[in-house]
Amino acid sequence: MFGKKKKKIEISGPSNFEHRVHTGFDPQEQKFTGLPQQWHSLLADTANRPKPMVDPSCITPIQLAPMKTIVRGNKSCKETSINGLLEDFDNISVTRSNSLRKESPPTPDQGAASRIQGHSEENGFITFSQYSSESDTTADYTTEKYRDRSLYGDDLDLYYKSSHAAKQNGHAMKMKHGDAYYPEMKSLKTDLAGFPVDYHTHLDSLRKSSEYGDLRWDYQRASSSSPLDYSFQLTPSRTAGTSRCSKESLAYSESDWGPSLDDYDRRPKSSYLHQTSPQPAMRQRSKSGSGLQEPMMPFGASAFKTHPQGHSYNSYTYPRLSEPTMCIPKVDYDRAQMVFSPPLSGSDTYPRGPTKLPQSQSKAGYSSGSHQYPSGYHKASLYHHPSLQTSSQYISTASYLSSLSISSSTYPPPSWGSSSDQQPSRVSHEQFRAALQLVVSPGDPREYLDNFIKIGEGSTGIVCIATEKHTGKQVAVKKMDLRKQQRRELLFNEVVIMRDYHHDNVVDMYNSYLVGDELWVVMEFLEGGALTDIVTHTRMNEEQIATVCLSVLKALSYLHNQGVIHRDIKSDSILLTSDGRIKLSDFGFCAQVSKEVPKRKSLVGTPYWMAPEVISRLPYGTEVDIWSLGIMVIEMIDGEPPYFNEPPLQAMRRIRDSLPPRVKDLHKVSSMLRGFLDLMLVREPSQRATAQELLGHPFLKLAGPPSCIVPLMRQYRHH
């Protein structure tokens, strides 16, 4: 009471203060202005961008890790608590699917240990999350759903027997059978069911029931004329909660393995493994690229009951996976048995090329020649690059991986197609890392790079910008954790395709490294962002459209001449420099064709941009990129691709069965541009123009210099 009054502490103001960033909010446009670079992809108005998807030829089997429980505040770890959390994710913005310009919110855990598998449907795609791993960070998960058509039926409409009526917006909806455009395609079923779990992963998880107390899966060949007929019996195990599933006895014929498009029709937040077993929904982005050669085996299948929701694209996360393993390599990506060229000479900042192998390793790489491949298995074959020659000093990735998976006595060779229950041979994390080390360069990029700033998060890892110490130049660094990849082998796409193909209109990759258990890809940083920003916020005139098309066609002509199919051409995959130059990116989805493997069948791409033959599961080649470019032209004209207001399944059905799409306002488009579009959007692939032919079209004479794109970037940033 009589004590001295304490002196008030004075805090000085900041010294050397600089106001570098001013962030505001425009009430008229309802948008933030002046955001820092790393905030753009979090708050950008790109929540409606669809995500790409892939054909699940064979999801890499993975080693199980203990499943995690979730504790959120005072909530108990019940199944309902996980499903309740999903309501919160609907309000989180999801950015476009471009892997170099993407952010996504952190992923939640997967739920209680009593669950076997969770799957959700996001943007019409049912995705599965089977296991938890040691880390809480995001991981890539390829929602691959289809197998080679010769194995599982002649069309996409035989995946399941119809068992559930479709619901849309809370009302039951019956769809009429439509006549398919292709004679090979039958009418679509009216009922909707979920996608099957991958055969190998599903069986592997259920056979390990002794560890987790879930289900015991007794399976044997059914007595049937078809070699692909199986009889499955679910029997109860220790977990009482799953005993209700024991009543189900599932017998699948060859037609049951045929994929169905109906699984894409809805976007519910969660779906169920069985009619009585709710599962947590995990949102993840699917990734293209069909990976290594898989065994000729069907997928396991179970009908899934789903709850339809609205059509808005919601946030998604990635499942945490423990160490995945992989099958014998195939020629679906890179060039099967690629010949690695020595480092390029010149003044490149980053030396390119792999390290030379020791003599013993070089010989080991070709030790798999005596292995007997199963029937129908495509043995890796060399794609003859005009500028590359075979050298015994450099070993091929596919050959090396094959030797790893076959020579080890721990992993006996597979006997797929026989009556045995033997699993595909596996490659450990250490073996895979050793194989990847042959492709990347030695050293640590942190020795010459600093100031790493995260600017995005893609389907396989995060993207940072970094500064070169000795020049001050900014580069993009894509960091991918090997242990958190659902399909580790797809990482070779990112490294080898970008390393071997250099063009003025292709994003340049400087180098790649293994830093611990992460693959770091150092590449060109394009300050202008993605074409998606321009398409969604501004309107392009025909000069600007022609300028973009000219650059993209030059890149495609170069890639197609090398036998590379991009398979995901869209505005998200087109990046711009600050001065308006246009470059093609995202090569994780590509495939290689050659004389030995002239066509592809995998369902790969983003639904609205897919060519009809891809959706129809017909063999396809480089022509699919031309169709996708035509859709991207419509995107530049109308601001979005055709059928963008429809769910992916309905859009895919219309692409497959209807006449080619057209722009909304034809009267606003010149006859020259209409003619240009008509050459690309041709249903018959053989009648579709090639990239080289399109480069001579009169419309491209309207193309201006790269500087004509700069005002669009300024206009977008002003918004």
UniProtKB/Swiss-Prot annotation:
GO terms for molecular function: ATP binding; protein serine kinase activity; protein serine/threonine kinase activity. The keyword Disulfide bond does not apply. It is found in: Mitochondrion; Cytoplasm; Nucleus. It catalyses: L-seryl-[protein] + ATP = O-phospho-L-seryl-[protein] + ADP + H(+); L-threonyl-[protein] + ATP = O-phospho-L-threonyl-[protein] + ADP + H(+). Residues 226-244, 357-372 have a biased composition (Polar residues). Residues 25-448 are annotated as: Linker. ATP binds at residues 455-463, 478. The keyword Ribosomal protein does not apply. Coiled coil: none annotated. Belongs to the protein kinase superfamily. STE Ser/Thr protein kinase family. STE20 subfamily. This is Serine/threonine-protein kinase PAK 5.
